[in-house]
């Protein structure tokens, strides 16, 4: 447990030294969200600017008035309002694939990474990151599909028993197992991407194999570290929702914006914290000699016995 705490602290230290990356990604997400929501905002303005019920959405949120606005012919097709948000979400994801190699290189550096090195790492690894993502989607999709089918079968079997609580607990335990398995796969591919970036590995499959071996050797510590950070993120989310309901009045748009954006910023920071912890694990393992290397060193450095 102490080793897990040390690695989590090391990851927090790395992420803290490079907190500008979190801020950059947050601002990029905020800008894309603004443009993505602009189409919906424009269509809503056309109706609310001439509606007596506008105050119920401007100084609060009335679900009935909201759905009434969506159903009015003047609002236009729903796709015209939602498609820009979808495309800007995809654009943010692609930007994350592009810039994450530079972030990982910055995390592994003991000094502030120059801008040209950051962008060089991004450009050199963009296609490798795409290939890693495709491998991740295939493997995680297959595993998640199998686990979901097994869980649904177990829940259906539990429904046929006389124990009324058994289906709920079966679904709860199944969801927890799926979360842990997908977290393990996420760790595996985080290590693979770190290996691609730090070793400048052209063959992505070699980094995937290397990431699998490193994850297997440190599985308990890595999974524990990622789960602890995920629990912290869940606590942040719960605190944000509680503050939203308990502190922010329904009429305060600014208060809701501040609490919501602060929560999203901290959730983004938690994911970067996980990445930094993986980099700390990777660097620690590189610094520590393997068992075979240690045995060879002891053989060649041992004094001769007369």
How does the language model describe each region?
Residues 1-12, 16-79, 99, 168-204, ...:
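Juxtamembrane transition segments at transmembrane-helix termini in multipass membrane proteins
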Residues 94-124:
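Hydrophobic transmembrane alpha-helix segments characteristic of membrane transport
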Residues 42-47, 143-160, 243-247:
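Membrane-helix interface motif
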Residues 90-102, 141-146:
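Mid-bilayer segments of alpha-helical transmembrane spans in multi-pass integral membrane proteins
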Residues 126-134, 215-228:
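Loop-to-transmembrane boundary segments
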Residues 76-93, 116-141, 165-179:
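Alpha-helical membrane-spanning segments of integral membrane proteins, especially the hydrophobic core
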